[in-house]
Amino acid sequence: MTGNTERLLIETTTAWGIPLSEHQYAQFQRYLDELIIWNDRFNLTAIRDRSAMIRRHLLDSLYLARDWQTAPANLIDIGSGAGFPALPLKIAYPTLPVTLVEATGKKAEFLRHVIECLELTDVRVLHERIETVGRNLAEREQYEVVTARAVAELRVLVEYALPLLRIGGRLLAPKGRDPTDEIAAAQRALHVLGGEVSACEPVHIPGEEPRSLVIITKIAPTPSRFPRAIGIPARRPL
């Protein structure tokens, strides 16, 4: 990778303690190439500028791993869209088992395509609604980490995410600059579903406005009636 923006990726990930090989940088390059090509057909992202993609997609995703001493046992990503943040994390941590949940067919098709192009292994794409996945006993309470970017407000998101987490697992939820009101509104849902906010951290990406990362830890089993039927969590939040 060459150029000022690519150097920003190299320098920033190094500063975050995420060492990447030339092969991994090449995978990021190919990922963006494919995203730009497919975006003309399917409108996968509103961000068209390559340098902005590196900042707002790649670095924004990799920020989640800046404190990882080792990769988690596994990760599931809700509403994966074009693959952020899960696929950048998979590229950075090749042995990390990753599951992507995407309900839109064209986006699931892109995810499968880019996984094949990058020759990534131990990655699954579930073309399903998240409510369905959360009620599947093969998926329920199986994951150490759930990620979800721009999916739903926090009180809705926790109903999607917490059923998938094992006790002690974490939901990593990137949010806006000040998520105080969202966190307050989610307290009842957290109590019912067995989670608690363990951290709310400022996120600083070079060249971008400050944002935050809300980390929720699962501290108790989620009642079996959650998540509720498709569409209900969003229409009638807890």
Swiss-Prot record:
This is Ribosomal RNA small subunit methyltransferase G. PANTHER family: S-ADENOSYL-L-METHIONINE-DEPENDENT METHYLTRANSFERASES SUPERFAMILY PROTEIN. It comes from Chloroflexus aggregans (strain MD-66 / DSM 9485). The lineage of its organism: Bacteria, Bacillati, Chloroflexota, Chloroflexia, Chloroflexales. It holds the Pfam family GidB. S-adenosyl-L-methionine binds at residues 79, 84, 102-104, 130-131, 149. GO terms for molecular function: rRNA (guanine-N7-)-methyltransferase activity. Its main location: cytoplasm. Keywords: Cytoplasm, Methyltransferase, rRNA processing, S-adenosyl-L-methionine, Transferase. CDD domains: AdoMet_MTases. InterPro entries: rRNA_ssu_MeTfrase_G, SAM-dependent_MTases_sf. Its EC number is 2.1.1.-. It is an enzyme of class 2 (transferase). GO terms for cellular component: cytosol. It is found in: Cytoplasm. Specifically methylates the N7 position of a guanine in 16S rRNA. Belongs to the methyltransferase superfamily. RNA methyltransferase RsmG family. The gene is rsmG. It comes from the Bacteria.
